[in-house]
Design a protein with these regions (language model features):
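Non-globular, low-confidence helical/coil segments that flank catalytic cores
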Residues: 1-273
Length: 273
């Protein structure tokens, strides 16, 4: 029984509810391979001088890391960091301190940026930083970026893979210009499950992109009542016009596709349930 609990027979794709951020678990059956796309994290906004400073804490300790430990997971084989924004990689120190992260995969160019490298200094174990781009030999198919550049939204990783009989496409914070590049190179590209770029912002998910991909489902990772108004009404209208069922972490909490073989089921779980 212990072995079954700590090495589950099923696999899963789990979109964590990390507020206004991204973090996605890709776990194959029996925990054979543990991959994550982003860690989540808080965007830092300037505070008035009269606001007292508070000790920094990482939400991941109570959300995605806690979930991994509940599944008997003490390591991460591949941690993909889509770009350098804090809402995607801000909780990286917590992962490096509490779990053995074997490899960090970043968009080509990000490995040269000193601004984020301080985040890896707290790692308890050695970890490899590997820059990737189109054509890189990694478990997921890299759809973007095409060349080394600063790790901003426009150079975000876009990753694709198959799990439980479905094809998944994860867009990070990639914008519409990046979507156009992908379609130009792959005019027949399709996917079953699309994780929308940039939390459902109108800067991503162009109508032509959605129409070409023909996703069966769309997933949005966004914070409840976030200050950006994500997901944007234009994006939701685009999905509705294309008749794409959509689910968001801000209303459904954690979203999971749990699978065995080529069959699976969708589950949602609000915090506190």
């Amino acid at each position: 029984m212990y072995g079954l609990i700590h090495a589950p027979l099923h696999g899963e794709v789990a979109y964590f509810d990390v507020g206004q951020g991204d973090s996605i678990l890709l776990r194959t059956p029996f925990n054979r391979r543990i991959s994550l796309i982003d860690t989540g994290g808080r965007l830092a906004f300037p505070q008035p001088k009269w606001v007292p400073a508070t000790p920094h804490s990482y939400g991941a300790t109570y959300t995605n890391i806690n979930y991994l430990r509940s599944r008997g997971i003490d390591h991460v084989d591949d941690l993909y960091l889509t770009h350098h924004d804090a809402d995607h990689i801000g909780d990286l120190p917590a992962f490096l301190k509490e779990l053995r992260v074997k490899r960090l995969l970043v968009p080509a160019g990000m490995e040269q940026e000193p601004q984020w490298q301080h985040l890896i200094r707290q790692s308890r174990w050695p970890t490899v930083v590997q820059p990737i781009r189109i054509g890189s030999a990694v478990p997921l198919t890299v759809r973007h970026p095409y060349e080394a550049a600063p790790a901003e939204n426009a150079n975000s990783l876009a990753l694709q893979g198959d799990f439980g009989g479905l094809n998944f496409l994860f867009m990070g914070d990639l914008d519409q210009a990046g979507e156009q590049k992908i379609l130009a190179d792959h005019p027949q590209l399709r996917t079953d499950v699309l994780k929308l770029g940039h939390h459902g912002s109108k800067t991503a998910s162009a109508p032509a992109f959605i129409q070409q991909l023909r996703p069966r489902w769309a997933v949005i990772s966004a914070g409840h009542q976030n200050r950006y108004g994500h997901p944007h009404a234009e994006t939701l209208a685009t999905l509705q016009a294309a008749q794409v069922p959509t689910v968001s972490t801000q209303t459904s909490g954690m979203i999971r596709y749990v699978y065995t073989g080529n069959h699976g089921r969708w589950q949602t779980k609000l915090k506190g349930e």
